[in-house]
Design a protein with these regions (language model features):
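C-terminal regulatory/effector modules of DNA-binding transcriptional regulators
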Residues: 94-240
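Long amphipathic alpha-helical segments
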Residues: 1-111
Protein backbone atom coordinates (compact mmCIF):
# COMPACT_ATOMS: atom_id res chain seq x y z
CA UNK A 1 0.00 0.00 0.00
CA UNK A 2 2.88 2.36 0.75
CA UNK A 3 4.35 1.70 -2.70
CA UNK A 4 0.98 2.33 -4.35
CA UNK A 5 0.68 5.61 -2.45
CA UNK A 6 4.07 6.68 -3.75
CA UNK A 7 2.91 6.07 -7.30
CA UNK A 8 4.37 2.64 -8.01
CA UNK A 9 2.02 0.72 -10.31
CA UNK A 10 0.49 -2.63 -9.32
CA UNK A 11 2.74 -4.54 -11.74
CA UNK A 12 5.82 -2.87 -10.25
CA UNK A 13 4.70 -3.68 -6.70
CA UNK A 14 4.56 -7.39 -7.57
CA UNK A 15 8.16 -7.25 -8.73
CA UNK A 16 9.23 -5.31 -5.66
CA UNK A 17 7.62 -7.83 -3.34
CA UNK A 18 9.54 -10.59 -5.08
CA UNK A 19 12.88 -8.79 -5.11
CA UNK A 20 12.57 -6.79 -1.89
CA UNK A 21 14.13 -3.76 -3.64
CA UNK A 22 12.63 -0.26 -3.36
CA UNK A 23 11.96 1.75 -6.52
CA UNK A 24 10.98 5.14 -5.12
CA UNK A 25 13.55 7.04 -7.19
CA UNK A 26 12.38 5.26 -10.33
CA UNK A 27 8.75 6.06 -9.49
CA UNK A 28 9.61 9.73 -8.93
CA UNK A 29 11.27 9.91 -12.33
CA UNK A 30 8.25 8.23 -13.92
CA UNK A 31 5.88 10.80 -12.45
CA UNK A 32 8.05 13.62 -13.74
CA UNK A 33 7.83 12.12 -17.21
CA UNK A 34 4.06 11.74 -16.91
CA UNK A 35 3.68 15.39 -15.89
CA UNK A 36 5.93 16.45 -18.76
CA UNK A 37 3.71 14.62 -21.23
CA UNK A 38 0.64 16.37 -19.86
CA UNK A 39 2.40 19.73 -20.01
CA UNK A 40 3.23 19.14 -23.67
CA UNK A 41 -0.44 18.42 -24.39
CA UNK A 42 -1.46 21.61 -22.59
CA UNK A 43 1.21 23.68 -24.35
CA UNK A 44 -0.05 22.40 -27.71
CA UNK A 45 -3.72 22.79 -26.68
CA UNK A 46 -4.19 19.15 -27.71
CA UNK A 47 -7.36 17.99 -25.95
CA UNK A 48 -7.50 14.51 -27.46
CA UNK A 49 -3.93 13.69 -26.52
CA UNK A 50 -4.41 15.18 -23.03
CA UNK A 51 -7.48 13.02 -22.56
CA UNK A 52 -5.64 9.91 -23.72
CA UNK A 53 -2.70 10.52 -21.38
CA UNK A 54 -4.95 11.16 -18.37
CA UNK A 55 -7.16 8.15 -19.12
CA UNK A 56 -4.08 5.93 -19.32
CA UNK A 57 -3.02 6.98 -15.81
CA UNK A 58 -6.57 6.71 -14.51
CA UNK A 59 -6.60 3.06 -15.56
CA UNK A 60 -3.48 2.38 -13.47
CA UNK A 61 -3.76 4.48 -10.32
CA UNK A 62 -6.46 5.46 -7.81
CA UNK A 63 -7.59 9.11 -7.72
CA UNK A 64 -5.77 9.90 -4.47
CA UNK A 65 -2.44 8.78 -5.94
CA UNK A 66 -3.07 10.69 -9.17
CA UNK A 67 -3.93 13.81 -7.22
CA UNK A 68 -0.83 13.57 -5.03
CA UNK A 69 1.71 12.52 -7.63
CA UNK A 70 0.34 13.96 -10.87
CA UNK A 71 -2.30 16.69 -10.69
CA UNK A 72 -1.22 18.84 -7.72
CA UNK A 73 2.47 18.91 -8.75
CA UNK A 74 1.37 19.58 -12.35
CA UNK A 75 -0.73 22.56 -11.27
CA UNK A 76 2.20 23.97 -9.28
CA UNK A 77 4.53 23.56 -12.26
CA UNK A 78 2.02 25.16 -14.61
CA UNK A 79 1.52 28.17 -12.35
CA UNK A 80 5.28 28.78 -12.41
CA UNK A 81 5.34 28.36 -16.19
CA UNK A 82 2.39 30.68 -16.71
CA UNK A 83 4.05 33.57 -14.92
CA UNK A 84 6.31 34.31 -17.88
CA UNK A 85 5.17 32.08 -20.74
CA UNK A 86 3.63 33.56 -23.91
CA UNK A 87 0.15 32.18 -24.42
CA UNK A 88 -0.24 31.45 -20.72
CA UNK A 89 -3.87 32.56 -20.54
CA UNK A 90 -4.87 30.38 -23.50
CA UNK A 91 -3.18 27.39 -21.86
CA UNK A 92 -4.84 28.12 -18.52
CA UNK A 93 -8.33 28.43 -20.01
CA UNK A 94 -7.79 25.31 -22.13
CA UNK A 95 -6.57 23.17 -19.24
CA UNK A 96 -9.06 24.39 -16.66
CA UNK A 97 -11.97 23.94 -19.11
CA UNK A 98 -10.82 20.41 -19.87
CA UNK A 99 -10.36 19.61 -16.18
CA UNK A 100 -13.82 20.84 -15.23
CA UNK A 101 -15.41 18.91 -18.10
CA UNK A 102 -13.44 15.74 -17.33
CA UNK A 103 -14.03 15.67 -13.59
CA UNK A 104 -17.56 17.03 -13.89
CA UNK A 105 -18.54 14.07 -16.06
CA UNK A 106 -17.14 11.63 -13.51
CA UNK A 107 -19.01 13.38 -10.69
CA UNK A 108 -22.24 13.22 -12.66
CA UNK A 109 -21.99 9.48 -13.26
CA UNK A 110 -20.88 8.78 -9.69
CA UNK A 111 -23.77 10.80 -8.28
CA UNK A 112 -26.25 8.61 -10.16
CA UNK A 113 -24.96 5.64 -8.14
CA UNK A 114 -24.91 7.27 -4.69
CA UNK A 115 -27.66 8.13 -2.25
CA UNK A 116 -27.84 10.35 0.79
CA UNK A 117 -27.20 14.03 1.38
CA UNK A 118 -24.47 15.50 -0.84
CA UNK A 119 -21.32 17.35 0.05
CA UNK A 120 -21.80 20.93 -1.17
CA UNK A 121 -18.64 22.56 -2.57
CA UNK A 122 -18.63 26.26 -3.37
CA UNK A 123 -15.97 28.41 -5.00
CA UNK A 124 -15.95 31.56 -2.85
CA UNK A 125 -13.05 33.29 -4.62
CA UNK A 126 -13.35 35.79 -7.47
CA UNK A 127 -11.68 33.38 -9.90
CA UNK A 128 -14.02 31.85 -12.49
CA UNK A 129 -12.70 28.32 -11.99
CA UNK A 130 -10.88 26.71 -9.06
CA UNK A 131 -9.05 23.53 -10.14
CA UNK A 132 -8.31 22.62 -6.52
CA UNK A 133 -12.01 22.59 -5.73
CA UNK A 134 -12.71 20.22 -8.63
CA UNK A 135 -9.91 17.93 -7.49
CA UNK A 136 -11.41 17.95 -3.99
CA UNK A 137 -14.83 17.11 -5.41
CA UNK A 138 -13.30 14.28 -7.46
CA UNK A 139 -11.56 12.79 -4.42
CA UNK A 140 -14.73 12.94 -2.32
CA UNK A 141 -16.83 11.48 -5.12
CA UNK A 142 -14.34 8.68 -5.72
CA UNK A 143 -14.55 7.84 -2.01
CA UNK A 144 -18.28 7.19 -2.34
CA UNK A 145 -19.77 10.59 -1.46
CA UNK A 146 -22.37 12.39 -3.59
CA UNK A 147 -21.28 15.94 -4.36
CA UNK A 148 -22.78 19.19 -5.63
CA UNK A 149 -20.44 21.86 -7.02
CA UNK A 150 -21.17 25.59 -7.28
CA UNK A 151 -18.47 27.06 -9.50
CA UNK A 152 -19.16 30.71 -8.65
CA UNK A 153 -19.45 32.52 -5.32
CA UNK A 154 -22.83 33.29 -3.76
CA UNK A 155 -23.85 36.18 -1.51
CA UNK A 156 -24.08 34.92 2.10
CA UNK A 157 -27.88 35.22 2.10
CA UNK A 158 -28.23 33.13 -1.06
CA UNK A 159 -25.64 30.66 0.21
CA UNK A 160 -27.78 30.13 3.29
CA UNK A 161 -30.81 29.60 1.04
CA UNK A 162 -28.93 27.04 -1.06
CA UNK A 163 -27.89 25.15 2.07
CA UNK A 164 -31.49 25.18 3.30
CA UNK A 165 -32.76 23.69 0.03
CA UNK A 166 -29.98 21.15 -0.58
CA UNK A 167 -29.58 20.02 3.05
CA UNK A 168 -25.96 18.90 2.52
CA UNK A 169 -24.01 16.63 4.86
CA UNK A 170 -21.34 19.36 4.94
CA UNK A 171 -20.46 22.64 3.25
CA UNK A 172 -16.99 22.99 1.73
CA UNK A 173 -15.90 26.53 0.86
CA UNK A 174 -12.90 26.77 -1.47
CA UNK A 175 -10.70 29.76 -2.21
CA UNK A 176 -7.19 30.13 -3.56
CA UNK A 177 -7.02 33.83 -2.71
CA UNK A 178 -7.53 36.21 0.20
CA UNK A 179 -11.05 37.17 1.25
CA UNK A 180 -12.39 40.24 2.98
CA UNK A 181 -12.29 39.55 6.73
CA UNK A 182 -15.90 40.52 7.36
CA UNK A 183 -17.07 38.49 4.37
CA UNK A 184 -15.00 35.52 5.52
CA UNK A 185 -16.60 35.49 8.97
CA UNK A 186 -20.09 35.70 7.44
CA UNK A 187 -19.32 32.81 5.11
CA UNK A 188 -18.11 30.56 7.90
CA UNK A 189 -21.05 30.84 10.28
CA UNK A 190 -24.65 29.79 10.62
CA UNK A 191 -24.77 26.28 9.14
CA UNK A 192 -26.58 23.31 10.67
CA UNK A 193 -23.87 21.00 9.35
CA UNK A 194 -20.07 20.80 9.40
CA UNK A 195 -18.21 23.43 7.39
CA UNK A 196 -14.77 23.09 5.80
CA UNK A 197 -12.63 25.93 4.49
CA UNK A 198 -10.18 24.66 1.89
CA UNK A 199 -7.42 26.13 -0.26
CA UNK A 200 -4.64 28.68 0.01
CA UNK A 201 -7.07 30.93 1.88
CA UNK A 202 -6.35 28.81 4.96
CA UNK A 203 -2.68 29.81 4.92
CA UNK A 204 -3.38 33.41 3.91
CA UNK A 205 -5.76 33.95 6.85
CA UNK A 206 -3.99 31.58 9.27
CA UNK A 207 -3.85 33.95 12.26
CA UNK A 208 -7.43 35.13 11.87
CA UNK A 209 -8.72 31.58 11.50
CA UNK A 210 -7.19 30.53 14.82
CA UNK A 211 -9.70 32.76 16.61
CA UNK A 212 -12.59 31.76 14.35
CA UNK A 213 -12.06 28.00 14.80
CA UNK A 214 -11.80 28.45 18.57
CA UNK A 215 -15.37 29.77 18.53
CA UNK A 216 -16.77 27.38 15.90
CA UNK A 217 -16.47 23.67 16.64
CA UNK A 218 -18.14 22.79 13.32
CA UNK A 219 -15.38 24.44 11.26
CA UNK A 220 -12.44 22.47 9.83
CA UNK A 221 -9.51 23.78 7.79
CA UNK A 222 -7.58 22.13 4.96
CA UNK A 223 -4.87 23.69 2.81
CA UNK A 224 -5.31 21.46 -0.25
CA UNK A 225 -7.53 18.71 -1.73
CA UNK A 226 -5.63 15.87 -0.05
CA UNK A 227 -5.91 17.52 3.36
CA UNK A 228 -9.61 18.09 2.69
CA UNK A 229 -10.07 14.39 1.92
CA UNK A 230 -8.36 13.49 5.20
CA UNK A 231 -10.59 15.91 7.12
CA UNK A 232 -13.73 14.51 5.50
CA UNK A 233 -12.56 11.00 6.38
CA UNK A 234 -11.79 11.94 9.99
CA UNK A 235 -15.23 13.55 10.31
CA UNK A 236 -16.87 10.41 8.85
CA UNK A 237 -18.56 12.48 6.14
CA UNK A 238 -17.75 10.43 3.06
CA UNK A 239 -20.14 7.51 3.35
CA UNK A 240 -23.92 7.51 3.24
Amino acid sequence: LTWLGRGVSVSQVKGLLRSGQPAFSEATSQWEEKRQRLQECICNLNERRLDECFNAELALYPPQTLCQQLMLPLLAELELRWRHSPGAQAERVFFFSWLRSKLGARLYHNNRQYSGAPLLLINVSDLPMAPGMWLTAWLASSAGCPVEVFDWPLPPTELALAVEHIQPRAVLLYSSQALNSTHLQRLLGGYDCPCLLVGQVVQIHAEELVAITAQNAELSLAADPLAALHSLTDLNLLHS
